[in-house]
């Protein structure tokens, strides 16, 4: 593994807590999880980490989860409205949003688990997800470049990434259970550390 499960959980909870404070929906916030997660990995682990986005498919204990749009020609694409983001770092695929999957889709009963796999173990196609934990990603570079460019125009994105990196501490170091931040009006707000507990790994 690139990072310990305890540190993965901490990164997920830090980002999740900031999203809740911003009233963003953590279940559809993969851009935040991937961008802030990559920033934390680069800052604290000194690894080259890149957020990627596009089509993503998972076999989660026999439950298939697909982030994609169905095209008129019958194929699926990750360049449309239904896309997903993940992190690629040192040959690993890490999805910091995986513990939020129970909230990501109504009626999806999957436990909150870590997703951290070698990229070399990725299935060869979307149709080859036979075992639990199997995954398939297809990065849509052009579509995601446009999405990220539009998204980064929001001034708070860089601030939140810095707050996330400042809040995170590698285990076994103590991490603050809450932090205080100033909102756009200069008012101080307390953000508690929040998120699902992990139930193992995919």
Set out the residue ranges of the language-model regions.
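A structural boundary/capping signal
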Residues: 1-202
